[in-house]
């Protein structure tokens, strides 16, 4: 099939003067089956106009949409060891990295930057789900740690947009090490008296849920997002019983006190600004924190 698709069909189209039509010109709504032109979807922040279904949003587009005027300082991707375990399943891990980089034009799954949201300076971190399922590995962990350290240095809050299947299995224990590393960095931000807000997006699962995704001061969630540790099917097979309707969705978690609010994507910047304005105002008798002491950087899990 690949030989026909990659060689024969282009030759025939060339002879007949036909042009290849990109496969992603039209996007189908998973909920209603509605077909939406890709430009219309992008202009509507990757939300299906009729149904309101929230599609996965690219990390770069999310930060551009979040910050005032789409202007922000993008953080460089830290250099770490590539494929330290020389892992291979049905495909070499090094090949998966190369393919994901070509597909997303990113070095790894984390995109982070410093900018302003309605005049409030903050650091934002977003997962790119199209990069190996937004999984947390050495590079992603190091990028998150650096983002927390930058927020502390700038004395500003940090907003996290997780979208991940969990820890990156191709990096084994080195991937799992990022759970405590990112948690330590998160606690450094809290010790500095700075807010940490998490905006849970679809999906947020696995080790990411077991660490920084559920440790925010405030937890927002986009409508219909899948949020949990293990998948619904795995839980049902383990417990041998049917789970409640809507289990592991944003709305279910809001009803059961796991998230503070469900916010539509179009309303996120305004809602963040309103919440941060409240959190950043110091009470009249607030105890002054000493943040002058320089915080030592966390050790890198594996260096290049």
UniProtKB/Swiss-Prot annotation:
Keywords: ATP-binding, Cytoplasm, Fatty acid biosynthesis, Fatty acid metabolism, Lipid biosynthesis, Lipid metabolism, Nucleotide-binding, Transferase
PROSITE patterns: COA_CT_NTER
Entry keyword Transcription: no
Localization in the cell: Cytoplasm
Domain CoA carboxyltransferase N-terminal: 25-294
Family according to the record: Belongs to the AccD/PCCB family.
Name used for this protein in its record: Acetyl-coenzyme A carboxylase carboxyl transferase subunit beta
Source organism of the structure: Rhizobium meliloti (strain 1021) (Ensifer meliloti)
Origin organism lineage: Bacteria, Pseudomonadati, Pseudomonadota, Alphaproteobacteria, Hyphomicrobiales
Encoding gene, per UniProt annotation: accD
